[in-house]
A protein has these predicted regions:
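Cytochrome P450 heme-thiolate "Cys pocket" and heme-binding signature region
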Residues: 47, 52, 90, 118, ...
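Cytochrome P450 heme-binding "Cys pocket" and the immediately downstream C-terminal segment
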Residues: 72-74, 140, 194-231
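Cytochrome P450 heme-thiolate monooxygenase catalytic domain
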Residues: 1-29, 70-81, 101, 105, ...
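Conserved cytochrome P450 K-helix/beta-meander segment immediately N-terminal to the heme-binding cysteine loop
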Residues: 142-172
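Conserved cytochrome P450 K-helix E-x-x-R motif and the immediately C-terminal K′/meander segment
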Residues: 30, 89-130, 141
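C-terminal helix/juxtamembrane-tail motif
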Residues: 145, 213, 229-243
């Protein structure tokens, strides 16, 4: 794939394409040795793009569908919002930004079942947090799942599906501790595909709920397991009927 991209762009002026792969190939072929990456780095990043762009979104959609299937009241609220904005037409980019109820449902599902359960970061400069000294180059694990399920932040109902906790935004939901909600990370190294993922999920849910009502199959066995991302060990069985 990399060789095909290089061959396709041969003869172009300063360009291997404007997508992620093109930018990586450009850095790989850079004349600046300080910024150049190796072929192994390039391949590793391509793997990251695949996992982050496919597995995590699939996982997120799976748990959102489960939450909607087991909470019919919220499913109806989201469906009514979709029909009010789009009717039976395809979702528009302008419209999906106004799906407030759906956004609440998505965020609450991501809180309960974040696709990525933890983040790894390397400390670039030694720092001190209270009495804790964190030296330079130490690898720090940020436990997203633990933060998402901390009752001191979210309250005693932390294990319940309550999308209305996000009714006034993440800051209000986390008691002004927005770093406690990390489905896509945070800061300069957060997920570059965050907005794309949100839009992809909203469009998919809109087109499903416009047409179908979802209920949980009695064959479903709840058993979340970590395989790249959190997913149902035995799959998700649902019943779908036309609205």
């Amino acid at each position: 794939m990399i060789k095909k991209r290089e061959a396709a762009m041969a003869g172009e002026i300063d360009g291997y394409g404007s997508d992620f792969l093109g930018q990586l190939v450009k850095v790989y072929r850079s004349a600046d040795m300080t910024s150049r990456i190796t072929i192994d780095d390039l391949i590793d990043e391509c793997k990251n793009f695949y996992i982050a762009g496919h597995e995590t979104t699939t996982s997120a959609l799976t748990w959102i569908v489960l939450m909607l299937a087991t909470h019919a009241d919220w499913q109806e609220k989201v469906r009514n919002e979709i029909l009010e904005l789009f009717g039976q037409q395809n979702p528009s980019l302008e419209g999906i930004s106004r799906l407030k109820t759906m956004s609440m449902v998505i965020n609450e599902s991501l809180r309960l079942y974040p696709p990525v359960v933890g983040l790894l970061r390397e400390v670039k400069k030694g720092t001190k947090m209270g009495n804790l000294i964190i030296p330079e180059k130490m690898e720090v694990h940020v436990p997203s799942l633990a933060l998402h399920h901390d009752p001191q932040i979210w309250g005693d109902d932390v294990h319940l599906f309550k999308p209305d906790r996000f009714a006034e935004g993440v800051a209000k939901a986390t008691k002004n501790n927005i770093s406690a909600f990390l489905p896509f990370g945070m800061g300069p190294r957060n997920c570059v595909g965050m907005n794309f993922a949100y839009n992809e999920i909203k469009i998919t849910l809109s087109m499903i709920l416009q047409r179908y009502r979802i209920t949980l199959s009695p064959n479903y066995v709840h058993s979340p397991v970590l395989v790249l991302a959190i997913c149902p060990q035995h799959g998700l069985q649902v019943t779908i009927k036309a609205v």
